[in-house]
């Protein structure tokens, strides 16, 4: 029996939410083209679309907003952010950006040349889009077990080092500017990478002159899982684990909207002097001065404070416990989920939930729509729609994992809210055979999952 600790915080301000009727939700979903991204927030009762920018800030962070230095250059809030990033992550240089994909854009532009290959432990939507936009081909080198939702391994985000070596042998190290190592791996179910695997990857890459760049968006969750699952670190602090993790990277991209506990912001970290200079030149073009990167001073201050709060053990323990709580309720009712449970979300296995719907009829997309209609809960498709099309052939990527992500915002919802989510999904699971597939009636050229529209099969 797991322990689900009480919230390690008090509620100081509230935002009212209201349940709609089923009739209303059916109309809202039809208007949204069966795409949960196209729902209005006021139409949603419990919003588990994403944990990106949806977390609750602390009183200290709100206080930090009041001491924003909005100087165009040399903001003292940037200096604070830079000091905190160096203390907790250990990188030499910090370039702020408006959010994570701003950092991805900088990294891809300064490091990739046409014809390159970027290996990584499973793709992520915006990350791969930036890599491909700059002429690279993404190569998945995650362990095979990550593609099976039912295999329960403590570190399913690990890189298969043999796959990495094989790629180096086939294309040459000069064609691999860096490895993109996600800690944790979102599309595998929030799966962590072990410290031992990071160490091994870094050693191999250093041998061949290949840089290691972390997608550090949920690095604190990864640090918690190392403490929980890697015996060597059971007595280590989250802060110390995090610092050691980052020592095996040459830099990272960060969406501050996740583990930095803010509503907007991100940054690129780099140790290399020349790459830093290139990033500073480009950030002026895309984002703003290197000392603000498209952010207000107040937002950099809130992010600096959020980084210090994120490594508090009681905070991160409760965060992960909320995921465990929801997962345990669903699993007890026979609902198929990805195992083991990650740190930011519970992922439903849509192929097993709706085995009668072929992947080409978008089962995860329809499941997310039906969860909303059933109980006003917004979730996100993470399957064939998110995977997009092959840039050369135009054919749909067909990932082995066809998932619906129930993403829990930080410090926002209580266990009672999660009870409603579980009850909604369990009720839907009981009449899952009545659910039909979808046709895609509008498909944008880029990142289609954001704005594509669908209609139910007749």
From Swiss-Prot:
Keywords: Lyase, Pyridoxal phosphate. It comes from Pasteurella multocida (strain Pm70). The keyword Oxidoreductase does not apply. Its cofactor is pyridoxal 5'-phosphate. The keyword Mitochondrion does not apply. It is an enzyme of class 4 (lyase). It catalyses: L-tyrosine + H2O = phenol + pyruvate + NH4(+). Belongs to the beta-eliminating lyase family. PROSITE patterns: BETA_ELIM_LYASE (PS00853). Its EC number is 4.1.99.2. This is Tyrosine phenol-lyase. One of its GO terms (molecular function) is tyrosine phenol-lyase activity. InterPro entries: ArAA_b-elim_lyase/Thr_aldolase, Beta-eliminating_lyase, PyrdxlP-dep_Trfase, PyrdxlP-dep_Trfase_major, PyrdxlP-dep_Trfase_small, Tryptophanase_CS, Tyr_phenol_ly. The modification N6-(pyridoxal phosphate)lysine is found at residue 258. GO terms for biological process: tyrosine metabolic process. Gene3D superfamilies: Aspartate Aminotransferase, domain 1, Type I PLP-dependent aspartate aminotransferase-like (Major domain). Homotetramer.
